[in-house]
Regions:
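Acidic carboxylate motifs that coordinate Ca2+ or other divalent cations, activating on Asp/Glu
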Residues: 130, 134
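Beta-propeller-forming repeat regions
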Residues: 24-125, 137-277
């Protein structure tokens, strides 16, 4: 946590930035935009199938499959033009996933499910610009009070037909992104800070919370991924900033957005922004 100097406070008041109606992020002098952060992907080789699977031919909603668990498998997403499909498998209370891409079929220990059911999304795109398309999968792995977590997987097909998963690392949106967040306090105002951007979070704070006990902000347990495809654009990350203070878990006060890029086995978050929620 940092205290805003009187000069900055005066500047904000003179320019009208102190008004309660202000919703946009404010510019913080003497700072620079948050720099991109990167981390290596979590690499997993797809397993050869351990049994002969009778693959379903029709796509069903994940909720429908959950309601009729008498069926051990379900096709949850497909890309007909690329001859690719994503399957969920249940056996003896264990779950795993199958990815079929042309003549390739591999098992992965991917999670999916709820209690909030969010359907997996599947794309085929040359994400890293190497001239070869990859399968892109976003699957929902966690939900609950203050929790909404999705995973991002980029799968490459190797020359021998095997499939390799490059997963977006949790540490990038948890530890690394959290380290860029901060709070700034004036006499009666509290701001969330990301690079040169400020968001007034005074009204988002619990009534009985003393801002002085704030250690800062973290990203909590919110991570979502989406794309602009088939239009131009890339992969988007959306998260949240929550209080780092004893007794206030998952108390979210601002939203975070960024773009995701992938190349050479490394993921990068760039164009980071902080927004009022």
């Amino acid at each position: 946590m940092r205290r805003l100097p009187p000069v900055l406070l005066a500047l904000m008041l003179l320019t009208g930035c102190g008004a309660w109606e202000t919703e946009a992020a404010l510019s913080l002098p003497k700072t620079v935009p948050a720099k991109p952060i990167s981390a290596p992907a979590v690499v997993t080789e797809g397993r050869n199938p351990t049994k002969d699977y009778d693959l379903p031919t029709e796509v069903v909603r994940q909720l429908e499959w959950g309601e009729r668990m008498g069926k051990p498998m379900a096709k949850l997403a497909e890309l007909p033009e690329q001859d690719a499909a994503f399957y969920a498998v249940e056996e003896d209370s264990s779950y795993w996933a199958l990815l079929r891409w042309g003549g390739s079929l591999a098992e992965f220990d991917w999670s999916f499910g709820g209690p909030l059911i969010v359907e997996p999304r599947l794309w085929c795109r040359d994400v890293d610009g190497d001239g070869q398309e990859e399968i892109v999968l976003v699957n929902h792995v966690g939900s609950g009070t203050g929790v909404s977590i999705e995973e991002l997987h980029i799968v490459e097909k190797n020359l021998d037909g095997t499939l390799t998963d490059y997963a977006f690392p949790e540490e990038l949106w948890q530890e690394d992104l959290s380290s860029l967040l901060d709070t700034a306090v004036t006499a009666d105002r509290t701001f969330a800070v990301l690079g040169e951007e400020l968001v007034d979070i005074t009204r988002q704070l619990p009534e009985n919370l003393d801002p002085e006990v704030l250690r800062g902000l973290g990203t909590g347990s919110v991570a979502r991924f989406d794309t602009d495809w088939p239009d131009s654009g890339g992969i988007r990350f959306n998260g949240s900033a929550c209080l780092d203070a004893d007794g206030y878990y998952y108390w979210y006060v601002a939203d975070i957005s960024a773009y995701v890029s992938y190349a050479g086995g490394v993921f990068t978050l760039s164009d980071l922004h902080l927004n009022s929620n």
